[in-house]
């Protein structure tokens, strides 16, 4: 198990280094954890697509992971097509990405800078007060606010929020 975590860490680092000079790297990468059958994750796909569309121009990259032991290339491709997800998304059937980045539920995001430092971890927004309890009005747009701060060169606050969603199985 420890070997798999080391390999995954090395692959993430190699993917970062392989791009070349740091100025060529994205300002930050939003790692998005999703599940095909999670209603809260499904709900947030539109918001994530809109954020990607807006912030990709600002140098923010998005990577999606379907953290589900049953996830396959085919199931992820079908999910991506059904919900029109514009960024790369891959199966995380081994849960190695979720374990490496500390994701516990879907949807959950982890924003890392070009050096791999975690800047933010948590919910996309506060649409859901609890599992199955959707607010009438979303009052906190956490991920959008983090990305806005990053593009303006401001400090990211808060550093984390509690994500509400479907549990990622513990390994």
Predicted regions and their residues:
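Short, internal strand/loop/helix patches
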Residues: 80-119
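Short active-site neighborhood of thiol/selenol oxidoreductases, capturing the structured segment around
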Residues: 25-39, 62, 147
């Amino acid at each position: 198990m420890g070997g798999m975590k080391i390999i995954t860490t090395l692959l993430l680092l190699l993917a970062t280094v392989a791009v070349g000079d740091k100025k060529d790297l994205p300002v930050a990468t939003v790692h998005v954890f999703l599940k095909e059958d999670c209603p809260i994750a499904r709900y947030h796909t539109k918001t994530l697509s809109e954020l990607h569309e807006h912030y990709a121009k600002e140098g923010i990259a998005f990577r999606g992971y379907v953290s589900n032991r049953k996830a396959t290339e085919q199931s992820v491709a079908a999910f991506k097509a059904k919900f029109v997800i514009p960024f790369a998304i891959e199966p995380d059937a081994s849960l190695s990405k979720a374990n490496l980045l500390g994701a516990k539920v879907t949807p959950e995001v982890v924003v890392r800078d070009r050096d791999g430092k975690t800047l933010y971890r948590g919910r996309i927004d506060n649409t859901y007060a609890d599992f199955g309890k959707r607010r009438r009005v979303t009052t906190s747009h956490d991920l959008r606010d983090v990305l806005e701060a990053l593009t303006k060169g401001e400090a990211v606050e808060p550093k984390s929020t509690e994500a509400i969603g479907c549990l990622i199985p513990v390994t």
